[in-house]
Amino acid sequence: MGCVQCKDKEATKLTEERDGSLNQSSGYRYGTDPTPQHYPSFGVTSIPNYNNFHGAGGQGLTVFGGVNSSSHTGTLRTRGGTGVTLFVALYDYEARTEDDLSFHKGEKFQILNSSEGDWWEARSLTTGETGYIPSNYVAPVDSIQAEEWYFGKLGRKDAERQLLSFGNPRGTFLIRESETTKGAYSLSIRDWDDMKGDHVKHYKIRKLDNGGYYITTRAQFETLQQLVQHYSERAAGLCCRLVVPCHKGMPRLTDLSVKTKDVWEIPRESLQLIKRLGNGQFGEVWMGTWNGNTKVAIKTLKPGTMSPESFLEEAQIMKKLKHDKLVQLYAVVSEEPIYIVTEYMNKGSLLDFLKDGEGRALKLPNLVDMAAQVAAGMAYIERMNYIHRDLRSANILVGNGLICKIADFGLARLIEDNEYTARQGAKFPIKWTAPEAALYGRFTIKSDVWSFGILLTELVTKGRVPYPGMNNREVLEQVERGYRMPCPQDCPISLHELMIHCWKKDPEERPTFEYLQGFLEDYFTATEPQYQPGENL
């Protein structure tokens, strides 16, 4: 169905020359661009027409689902006759302030102003109301971005994490941008067999010069929708047929509202502390709400912990750090007692998760994957020329699906407590700190790499305190003499060798987080091809 050129048994075989005409220019590497991807800014009558499915020859193509592109409702005609692209809601959204709109999945909008970045001013065609909507909750009508199976800029490892989530059957699939070939896509499918059990296979979707798509030259399609329809009806050489699109989690918002995007010092009265989650040396962590309707985490700092002026200066930098493996800073109350408002992670700290929570039953593949997620977040911090200074499992938070995010980055530098600033005082995390940082205060991204090596031991030992049986002074002395922790029980030698690499005396000999991310993401798949050729493809 929708197949432009499907090979039947009696059909003549297509030549392979078409492959050579593909544009194989090298594309970006996933994760190197820290800037979120947005649609371009546009005015009411200058929105690019994402809904145009007409090929180079001007022939109208049939859109997936049998709707002809010439009659779809994705374009609103203005009085002057110009077309304005309509957007459709991909999720439900509940308004948080009087400035934004509540809406339901499937609702259509005309975009009035997109100059606010993550928040667009829009008019609902259902209610006629005008207000702000989060831009990552909508997509152009009839575009591939609006399809349930399209995940956009998603890396191979993250695709595998989502597809292997509990409850997805064999044949669950998604399509994402190719990491290696600009303009191409990847089809990722959950599969199962006796030898591997549940696993994911990836197929490259290539683009024809005339705008079509194919996995094999024997079956070419004018649209991705038609390709999905075809392989939903038959495996046709894939590991299995496409059964159901992977579930999309709600996209995260990097701001509480359009107003807090730039003015994010908020009144203390707008926050409600509901449940205390933890109590530390410098304050408490609460689950709470903002404006009575938005769940957040609130870190309250004891008065005197840090200078409000210094904190606000550092928070300006922290607010700009946006990555899906970093806990997002939303807002602050900068007068003492200082409140730090962040996204809420429902499984708590990685340390507690490993010692007393669901993490006790985790096997090595899950633990290595969690380490890879932390490395991915730290690789972003590395690219941004920032430093964490206090990387350990207590400062990693866990969410549903074993998602890990880095918290408290940058705060350690601001602490003014004498028991901490002495670096060898009772409150200082000596066992996680590189010797050059503990002894001489030389904190760099390479001292963070040392700490990451210690965090790896926490993962494989399910939260055991590093250097068991040794106090802080003994650890400092022994490490300076060259002592390194031995390989933990049941830890693979190759993983311990990575820890030792992180603990090199010379900081410059330690690996980068980019290397650590790649090593850990490919730890169990290094010997397998990244893309499947497919049977009979």
UniProtKB/Swiss-Prot annotation:
Pfam family for this entry, one: PK_Tyr_Ser-Thr
Names of required cofactors: Mn(2+)
Control of this protein's activity: Inhibited by phosphorylation of Tyr-531 by leukocyte common antigen and activated by dephosphorylation of this site.
Catalytic center residues: 390
Entry-linked SUPFAM superfamilies: Protein kinase-like (PK-like), SH2 domain, SH3-domain
GO CC annotation terms, alphabetical: actin filament; cytosol; dendrite; endosome; glial cell projection; membrane raft; nucleus; perikaryon
GO BP: any one term: adaptive immune response
Residue span(s) of domain Protein kinase: 271-524
Annotated catalysed reactions: L-tyrosyl-[protein] + ATP = O-phospho-L-tyrosyl-[protein] + ADP + H(+)
Domain SH3: residue ranges: 82-143
Positions with a binding annotation for ATP: 277-285, 299
Enzyme class: transferase
Top-rank lineage group of the source organism: Eukaryota
Residues with Phosphoserine modification: 21, 26
The SH2 domain, residue ranges: 149-246
MF (Gene Ontology): alpha-tubulin binding; ATP binding; disordered domain specific binding; ephrin receptor binding; G protein-coupled receptor binding; growth factor receptor binding; identical protein binding; metal ion binding
Phosphotyrosine modifications at: 185, 420, 531
Keywords on record: Adaptive immunity, ATP-binding, Cell membrane, Cytoplasm, Developmental protein, Immunity, Kinase, Lipoprotein, Manganese, Membrane, Metal-binding, Myristate, Nucleotide-binding, Nucleus, Palmitate, Phosphoprotein, Proto-oncogene, SH2 domain, SH3 domain, Transferase, Tyrosine-protein kinase
Post-translational modification summary for this protein: Autophosphorylated at Tyr-420. Phosphorylation on the C-terminal tail at Tyr-531 by CSK maintains the enzyme in an inactive state. PTPRC/CD45 dephosphorylates Tyr-531 leading to activation. Ultraviolet B (UVB) strongly increase phosphorylation at Thr-12 and kinase activity, and promotes translocation from the cytoplasm to the nucleus. Dephosphorylation at Tyr-420 by PTPN2 negatively regulates T-cell receptor signaling. Phosphorylated at tyrosine residues, which can be enhanced by NTN1. Palmitoylated. Palmitoylation at Cys-3 and Cys-6, probably by ZDHHC21, regulates subcellular location.
Alphabetical list of InterPro entries matching this protein: Fyn/Yrk_SH2, Fyn/Yrk_SH3, Kinase-like_dom_sf, Non-receptor_tyrosine_kinases, Prot_kinase_dom, Protein_kinase_ATP_BS, Ser-Thr/Tyr_kinase_cat_dom, SH2
PANTHER family linked: TYROSINE-PROTEIN KINASE
Record's subunit section: Interacts (via its SH3 domain) with PIK3R1 and PRMT8. Interacts with FYB1, PAG1, and SH2D1A. Interacts with CD79A (tyrosine-phosphorylated form); the interaction increases FYN activity. Interacts (via SH2 domain) with CSF1R (tyrosine phosphorylated). Interacts with TOM1L1 (phosphorylated form). Interacts with KDR (tyrosine phosphorylated). Interacts (via SH3 domain) with KLHL2 (via N-terminus). Interacts with SH2D1A and SLAMF1. Interacts with ITCH; the interaction phosphorylates ITCH and negatively regulates its activity. Interacts with FASLG. Interacts with RUNX3. Interacts with KIT.
Family: Belongs to the protein kinase superfamily. Tyr protein kinase family. SRC subfamily.
Protein name in UniProt: Tyrosine-protein kinase Fyn
Phylogenetic placement of the source organism: Eukaryota, Metazoa, Chordata, Craniata, Vertebrata
